[in-house]
Amino acid sequence: MAKKKSTKRKKSTRNPEAAERNKRIAIVSSLVVLAGAVFVAGAMGVAELDRAAASSIVSGTPEVVIHWDTLSDGSVWMPRQEQERLNLAIARAVQGGRALSAEPLKEAVLTLQSSGWVRGVPEARWTSEGQIVLDAAWRVPAAAVRVGSREVIIDWDRYVLPLDYAIGQSNQYYFTNTDAPLPQTGQQWVGTDLQDGITLLRELSKNDLLEQVAGFDLGSGADSGVISIITKRGTRIVWGGGPGRERPGEKNTSVKLDRMRVLYERAGLIDGGVPYVDLRGKDIMIDSNPGG
């Protein structure tokens, strides 16, 4: 068997400058590799977080919390049935929405905004518990307008609310003989006659003269815009043009209010205890037998 031939290595001459240069290159290369490894690991961690977050965003029916408007005692004034109707409509609108996404918020806002109950655009937000919270500027019922056999509820700006009742069942001051026809829910009832009527309603309220009032007749035909106050006794007090919009020969609002106070002080009734009173002229006109 032939023996392997042994060879001797020649010792190389070591260059100190080259060795130092190679050392620096090795250190820099190590740092670059380490940074790359950290970057990749970090990227993988972010991706895992994204996947974990995405897995928690699932389709479903988020719980909706509506901040209702309240009275001074903290109680909600909106009828329970109407609260339930709105809750159901909004729950249907957001059903199947992805939690923490914008789409359910948009649907909730659009549904509440189109209900006729709010002014402007409602605000919606997600809570950390996955609930949708809704805040809005609510339209408050002010009166009813009689249309046919129904009483349609309006707010103080004459916007039609999604409520109507049989005649005498609304528990609101009513208006009859409006010039303009009934608009759609959520739209404003136009016409200076109804505007004047609401203004008079405010004036009587500020002067504590509403207790015996049932409603207002806005006049028709030649007397359109001539407002008459209808008392709970069924008597009539002719007021005239709206406050600040008096017709020629009419006394102003302060005089008419003073006359109502005088009648109340004498008889304990704002109509003075008679069926017909006219507040417009130089003197109070009283008719004890208007049908005679």
Describe each model-derived feature in a short phrase:
Residues 1-70, 89-292:
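Charged, solvent-exposed interaction patches on well-folded alpha/beta domains
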